[in-house]
């Protein structure tokens, strides 16, 4: 079967939810037995989001193959079974970087390098290579139609229809249809102007998904169809819903998947959305609720922890519990004290970089340990738990990390090339090592310790989880910490690196170096988050032992 492409653009305003809409459509097509993937084209100049501020851009989603990508790829993986790779996300910066590299190498044989054809050809090549082997590829173009940054991408997808055939390309445009209370009606003019802008670039949309806070009346949909030159059945009303997992069913109920399959001449069975119906049922029928505190340093933008928040909700689904998440700034804990943590059923400390707010996280880990509150530490959340235990239980009062204190005498956490023992002797490791002084990123296998809590939770001896960090537990100081009662519950398969720690005499205290949130989905959940939320429910009822 030849690959079919659906190009998803947005108009009128930003943040309309193109990623959720594209992922929901992909979920329906996957439920019809099609092999589907999704790509995200980002118009910013950064080569990737890896060094961008989480407060500006939101979280960096890590793929199995180690790509640092846009958070929308997290939505994609939560909605479809296909795993994303580095081919599923690229930026203007990545494209220009590659074109300039080819120019320096002489690949263009002395030609004048221009946006058309060189930049647009590079974009098209990446779209085609990323879609190889799939029946349908959804391509989300970041930004809003009319933005100057998006023009090369829009020109490239316009050319795709010419090169792969109009019968294998489809343009889906997401717009806003606002409701004006003073007039008592929805207004279609912004959508008409957005489509006009798209037409000026040479793209006639085939489908319009119209976002609104209410169902768009049939007469208004007919008006949009007439003025935008789109069949009325291809004007889809997408009203606000209380759960994003209702969107696949909402789109299917309006025949969107049937329209697309007929457009591409695809003969496939009806979509079976029973899994999504089960998710919706679990979400709508909880048996109780818990409050989990998340103590981080980027809490002013919840999207900085998007996958963690979603994973906690998935854990709630699997336990039939509503999870209320209380976001707490670690600097506030540092300055105002652990009083802020009272009344919580569980505590999670997520990942982060740098020293700001770290002492507040260490105080949080201590509070959870001393008060027998369920604790889940992720990445930096594991490192602060280790530092706290080292200082207050193992007697290593000066324990710290070289990330926060480059000259600290007892670095229980450090770059592999910085490990020191108790006598201050530096153990020099090779700078050529894959881990020495570099970011450890992507899926890594981990062997779980026999009789550990995590081995029971996972039900497996070996797991693969995704990492994104530079600092590791210092093995040279580990024995003293283990002798004080800390358990290493998971190690890298070569037995060199600590991946998971537990406190056996605590009811539920687990911390991991990897990021389990990246592999949690609403249909399957994740063993750590499911177990964590279950522990929160038991703690609330006084049943956690």
Curated annotation (Swiss-Prot):
Q: Which PROSITE patterns match?
A: GATASE_TYPE_1
Q: Where does CTP bind?
A: 14, 147-149, 187-192, 223
Q: In which pathway does it act?
A: Pyrimidine metabolism; CTP biosynthesis via de novo pathway; CTP from UDP: step 2/2
Query: Which residue ranges does the record annotate as region Amidoligase domain?
Result: 1-266
Q: Which molecular-function annotations from GO does this UniProt entry contain?
A: ATP binding; CTP synthase activity; glutaminase activity; identical protein binding; metal ion binding
- Protein residues bound to L-glutamine: 352, 380-383, 403, 470
- What CDD domains does the entry give? CTPS_N, GATase1_CTP_Synthase
Q: Where is the active site?
A: 379 (nucleophile), 515, 517
Keyword Cell cycle in annotation: no
| BP terms from Gene Ontology | 'de novo' CTP biosynthetic process; pyrimidine nucleobase biosynthetic process
Q: Which residues bind ATP?
A: 15-20, 72, 239-241
Where is it found, in Gene Ontology cellular component terms?
Answer: cytosol
Per the database record, which ranges form the Glutamine amidotransferase type-1 domain? 291-542
- Identify the residues that bind Mg(2+): 72, 140
Record comment: activity regulation: Allosterically activated by GTP, when glutamine is the substrate; GTP has no effect on the reaction when ammonia is the substrate. The allosteric effector GTP functions by stabilizing the protein conformation that binds the tetrahedral intermediate(s) formed during glutamine hydrolysis. Inhibited by the product CTP, via allosteric rather than competitive inhibition.
Q: Which UniProt keywords apply?
A: ATP-binding, Glutamine amidotransferase, Ligase, Magnesium, Metal-binding, Nucleotide-binding, Pyrimidine biosynthesis
Which major enzyme category is it? ligase
Question: Which residues does the record give as UTP binding sites?
Answer: 14, 187-192, 223
**What's the Enzyme Commission number for this chain?**
6.3.4.2
Residue ranges spanning the membrane: these are none
Q: What's the subunit arrangement here?
A: Homotetramer.
The UniProt similarity line reads:
Belongs to the CTP synthase family.
What protein name does the entry list?
Answer: CTP synthase
Taxonomic lineage per UniProt? Bacteria, Pseudomonadati, Pseudomonadota, Gammaproteobacteria, Enterobacterales
Q: Which gene encodes it?
A: pyrG
């Amino acid at each position: 079967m030849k690959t079919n492409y659906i190009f998803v653009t947005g108009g009128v305003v930003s943040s309309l939810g193109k990623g959720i809409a594209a992922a929901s459509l992909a979920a329906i097509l996957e439920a019809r037995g099609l092999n589907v993937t999704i790509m995200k084209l980002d118009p910013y100049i950064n080569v990737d989001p890896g060094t961008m501020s989480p407060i500006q851009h939101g979280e960096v989603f890590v793929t199995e193959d180690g790509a640092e990508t846009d958070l929308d790829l997290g939505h994609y993986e939560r909605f479809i079974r296909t795993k994303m790779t580095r081919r599923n996300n690229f930026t203007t910066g990545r494209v220009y970087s590659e074109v300039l590299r080819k120019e320096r190498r002489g690949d263009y044989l002395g030609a004048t390098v221009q946006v058309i054809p060189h930049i647009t050809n590079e974009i098209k090549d990446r779209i085609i290579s990323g879609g190889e082997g799939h029946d349908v590829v959804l391509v989300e173009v970041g930004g809003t139609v009319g933005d100057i940054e998006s023009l090369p991408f829009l020109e490239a997808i316009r050319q795709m229809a010419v090169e792969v055939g109009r019968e294998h390309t489809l343009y889906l445009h997401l717009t806003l249809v606002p409701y004006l209370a003073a007039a008592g009606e929805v207004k279609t003019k912004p959508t008409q102007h957005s489509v006009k802008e798209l037409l000026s670039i040479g793209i006639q949309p085939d489908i319009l998904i119209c976002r609104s806070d209410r169902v768009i009346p049939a007469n208004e949909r007919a008006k949009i169809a007439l003025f935008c030159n789109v069949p009325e059945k291809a004007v889809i009303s997408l009203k606000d819903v209380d759960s994003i997992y209702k969107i696949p069913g909402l789109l299917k109920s309006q025949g969107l998947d049937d329209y697309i399959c007929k457009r591409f001449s695809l003969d496939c069975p009806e979509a079976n959305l029973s899994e999504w119906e089960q998710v919706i049922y679990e979400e709508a029928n909880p048996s109780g609720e818990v409050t989990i505190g998340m103590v981080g340093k980027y809490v002013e933008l919840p999207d900085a922890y998007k996958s963690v928040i979603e994973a906690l909700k998935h854990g709630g689904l699997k336990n039939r519990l509503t999870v209320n998440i209380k976001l707490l700034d670690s600097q506030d804990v540092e300055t105002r004290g652990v009083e802020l943590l009272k009344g919580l059923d569980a505590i999670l400390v997520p990942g982060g970089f740098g020293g700001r707010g770290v002492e507040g996280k260490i105080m949080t880990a201590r509070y959870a340990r001393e008060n027998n509150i369920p604790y889940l530490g992720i990445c930096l959340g594991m490192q602060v738990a280790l530092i706290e235990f080292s200082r207050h239980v193992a007697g290593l009062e000066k324990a710290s990390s070289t990330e926060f204190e480059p000259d600290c005498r007892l670095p229980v956490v450090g770059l592999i090339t910085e490990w020191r023992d108790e006598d201050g002797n530096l153990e020099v490791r090779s700078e050529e090592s894959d881990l020495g002084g570099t970011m450890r990123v992507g899926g890594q296998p981990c062997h779980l310790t026999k009789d550990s809590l995590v081995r029971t939770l996972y039900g497996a001896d070996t797991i693969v989880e995704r990492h994104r960090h530079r600092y590791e537990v210092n093995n040279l100081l580990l024995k003293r910490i283990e002798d004080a009662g800390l358990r290493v519950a998971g190690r890298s398969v070569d037995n060199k690196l600590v991946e998971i720690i537990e406190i056996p005499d605590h009811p539920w205290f687990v911390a991991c170096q990897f990021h389990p949130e990246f592999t949690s989905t609403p249909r399957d959940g994740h063993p750590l988050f499911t177990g964590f939320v279950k522990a929160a429910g038991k703690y609330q009822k006084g049943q956690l032992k």
